[in-house]
Amino acid sequence: MALRNLMTKKPFAGILTFRQQLRCVQTFSLPDLSYDYGALEPAISGEIMQLHHQKHHQTYITNYNNALQQLHDAINKGDSPTVAKLQGAIKFNGGGHINHSVFWKNLAPTREGGGEPPKGSLGSAIDTNFGSLEAVIQKMNAEGAALQGSGWVWLGLDKELKRLVIETTANQDPLVIKGPNLVPLLGIDVWEHAYYLQYKNVKPDYLKNIWKVINWKYAAEVYEKECP
């Protein structure tokens, strides 16, 4: 996530308040993809990838940055109602940015290892916690297909219990909403914008085919870092 600082006026000297922690506002920018938009075809079309990345993800970032700036201004003004009102926009758009930033890394072209089963410690953990990789895929597909409305289905690591979990989140809620110790290893976007242009209303087909381009290598790297 690229960051740049927008410097603002310092609050009155000698007053140690939360305002002093907000003398600069961090803003976020659209992350580059490590592959071309068409590189995931036929599992995910280039048209969907371009629209999803350039339009949908960018919109979350733009709205997130705007909400953060408004929050900064409201805190400096002591405008508590506006501070409270902005929490929903920050959660939704910030979550959209967080989730999509993980999602792009969870994908890889087949020629670059997309779809290859996980090995090493993550592969062993999957067998221990779920019995097999196929069981994980079936459970995540079932959870994703059953999710009402928009949301995400996740394979996560519970760092405290040192075990893998499968969870769903609504709208753009990030996985951490389900627990502060949960780390996302793999997230699948089940919003219609992720598949409708190609799969229409047949979400199960999208969920079936996306595994052909899942980047298990990235998931394994996160797992090994968080659960050495």
Swiss-Prot record:
InterPro entries: Fe/Mn_Superoxide_Dismutase, Mn/Fe_SOD, Mn/Fe_SOD_BS, Mn/Fe_SOD_C, Mn/Fe_SOD_N, Mn/Fe_SOD_N_sf, SOD_C_sf. Coiled coil: none annotated. Disulfide bonds: none annotated. Its cofactor is Mn(2+). It is an enzyme of class 1 (oxidoreductase). It is found in: Mitochondrion matrix. Its main location: mitochondrion. Destroys superoxide anion radicals which are normally produced within the cells and which are toxic to biological systems. This is Superoxide dismutase [Mn], mitochondrial. It comes from Capsicum annuum (Capsicum pepper). The gene is SODA.
